[in-house]
């Protein structure tokens, strides 16, 4: 509110904001793809049991060398219900009589088969090595593949709980730097994990630091930016991760061994860690947390970088006068209880938490299971990211013209419809199913950007990170619950996707329980969220008319 006047004085979108936003966007572009990294590093290739007569070069039982690979496969591996080689069982003894049967007959009694006691043979045409091939996470151990995703999401969940409160107490920049250090170390160490348990433990620690990085980078952009540029920032926030996803798809194509891909994606984070020393702490946060001297120092630094010649005129008296109400409020330390102190803020927290839960179940449910949509995960990820960038380009125009609520309604509804169409399209129409799923995932990033922007605009600065942490608690609950919905596929193959699509459509209409925030100033205190903020918003709308009349 009154901080906006100070921001205008030092430059609301100058050289400082551009450099800081570019850095934080690049940081998002390199961190976010790690959330779905296991689409590549944990890809499940086609596989079958290892059998001596087929895979041991020294074997020559019964003159098998004169038989083709297809014949050897036929007598060694039983067929499943789709007449494809079984992935998890083999014949206990070669079934020579099958060579004389028509290919449509595959009646083999259960006692003639056994599990893959000698291991598996993997199709390495897409990836030379993944954690699945390294630790044999297939057949009876296939559930462990979900454990890797679950461990990362649990880390994300816990990180979301603790990050908000720490950010409001210790500052955006400090928590961001600490989290980035932890993320860089753990994700680099993942590449050298000697066992599955250590791998999951490191992924848990990495997940623990993701939410503090994303939340605080968004807050540092938000709290240094004028409201009229927030829609542009939301679009850029949607584009940045997808540029990262496109790069990760390209790197996955170049580095087919998961250790190398993991290192290539993780080591550059240390470079960004070094650059965080030049980040500026949020002056808005410093002032409203009763640190006006430090806030003034940051404002003067920004004014100097933006080339504002009157930066020396900015004094402590001006800051205290402009932010008098906020400084008075800052004398009392905000607590978690303050989130529910007023009925309006309480309602917003509850609605946003409810929405975020269903939102993340649907978003992550689709994002981390892309391999179910296509065998060529690299190409699919690249196409989805390219589409998401194109969709994000129109984001600012849509947000500026029709606002946050209508944009969110349209995007989430379309996303849910695309998912449901993909579900009910016949299996034979695979191309259409992939197109629908690609469209659904393509608009997901803009949905995330709009959701984060609208959420931050509804919360006061003094409690923003804490509130985002509470909302993130429910959101991250959805993130680790989303893989569990895939267990429903054992009862009905399309059931998980029906839930993902239905949640998206349901979530779209709950946005009308929240107010529109287009062209409105950010609230700085809980007082601004109440009726006084509504009056100030009304006054802001009337100001231009008053000025024109006086002129």
Curated annotation (Swiss-Prot):
Residues 523-551 are annotated as: Disordered. The chain crosses the membrane at residues 16-36, 146-166, 174-194, 204-224, 235-255, 259-279, 349-369, 377-397, 406-426, 433-453, 468-488, 495-515. The keyword DNA-binding does not apply. GO terms for cellular component: plasma membrane. Keywords: Cell membrane, Glycoprotein, Membrane, Transmembrane, Transmembrane helix, Transport. Residues 37-145, 195-203, 256-258, 370-376, 427-432, 489-494 are extracellular. This is Solute carrier family 22 member 27. It comes from Mus musculus.
């Amino acid at each position: 509110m009154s901080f906006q006047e100070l921001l205008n004085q030092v430059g609301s979108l100058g050289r400082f904001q551009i450099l800081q936003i570019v850095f934080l966007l690049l940081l998002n572009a390199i961190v976010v793809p790690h959330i779905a990294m296991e689409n590549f590093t944990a890809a499940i290739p086609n596989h079958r049991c290892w059998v001596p007569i087929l895979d041991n070069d020294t074997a020559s039982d019964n003159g098998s060398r004169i038989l083709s690979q297809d014949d050897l496969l036929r007598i060694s591996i039983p067929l499943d219900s789709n007449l494809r080689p079984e992935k998890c069982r083999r014949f206990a003894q070669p079934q020579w009589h099958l060579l004389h049967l028509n290919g449509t007959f595959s009646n083999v009694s259960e006692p003639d088969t056994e599990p893959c006691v000698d291991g598996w043979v993997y199709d390495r045409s897409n990836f030379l090595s993944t954690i699945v091939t390294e630790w044999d996470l297939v057949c009876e151990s296939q559930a462990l593949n979900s454990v890797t995703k679950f461990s990362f999401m649990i880390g994300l969940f816990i990180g979301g709980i603790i990050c908000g409160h720490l950010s409001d107490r210790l500052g955006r920049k400090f928590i961001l730097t600490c989290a980035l250090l932890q993320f860089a170390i753990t994700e680099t160490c993942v590449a050298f994990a000697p066992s599955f348990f250590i791998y999951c433990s490191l992924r848990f620690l990495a997940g623990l630091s993701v939410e503090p990085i994303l939340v605080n980078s968004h807050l540092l952009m938000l709290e240094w930016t004028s409201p009229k540029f927030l829609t542009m920032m939301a679009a850029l926030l949607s584009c940045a991760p997808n540029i990262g996803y496109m790069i990760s798809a390209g790197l996955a194509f170049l580095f087919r061994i998961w250790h190398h891909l993991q290192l290539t994606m993780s080591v550059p984070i240390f470079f960004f860690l070094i650059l965080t020393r030049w980040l500026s702490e949020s002056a808005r946060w410093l002032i409203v947390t009763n640190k006006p001297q430090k806030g003034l120092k940051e404002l003067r630094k920004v004014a100097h970088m933006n080339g504002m010649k009157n930066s020396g005129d900015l004094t402590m008296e001006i800051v205290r006068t402009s932010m008098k109400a906020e400084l008075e409020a800052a004398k009392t330390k905000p607590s978690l209880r303050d989130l529910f102190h007023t009925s309006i803020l309480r309602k917003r927290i509850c609605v946003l938490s409810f929405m975020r839960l269903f939102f993340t179940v649907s978003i992550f449910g689709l994002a981390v299971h892309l391999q179910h949509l296509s065998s060529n995960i690299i190409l699919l990820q690249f196409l989805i990211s390219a589409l998401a960038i194109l969709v994000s380009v129109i984001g600012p125009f849509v947000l500026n013209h029709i606002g946050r609520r209508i944009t969110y309604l349209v995007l989430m509804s379309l996303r849910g419809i695309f998912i449901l169409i993909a579900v009910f399209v016949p299996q034979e129409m695979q191309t259409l199913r992939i197109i629908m799923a690609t469209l659904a995932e393509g608009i997901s990033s803009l949905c995330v950007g709009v959701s984060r922007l609208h959420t931050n605009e509804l919360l006061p600065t003094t409690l923003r990170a804490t509130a985002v942490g509470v909302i993130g608690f429910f959101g991250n609950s959805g993130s680790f619950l989303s893989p569990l919905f895939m267990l429903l596929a054992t009862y009905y193959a399309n059931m998980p996707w029906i839930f993902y699509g239905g949640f998206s459509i349901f979530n779209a209409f709950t946005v009308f329980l929240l107010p529109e925030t287009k062209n409105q100033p950010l609230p700085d205190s809980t007082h601004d969220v109440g009726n006084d903020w509504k009056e100030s918003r009304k006054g802001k709308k009337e100001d231009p008319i008053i000025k024109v009349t006086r002129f």
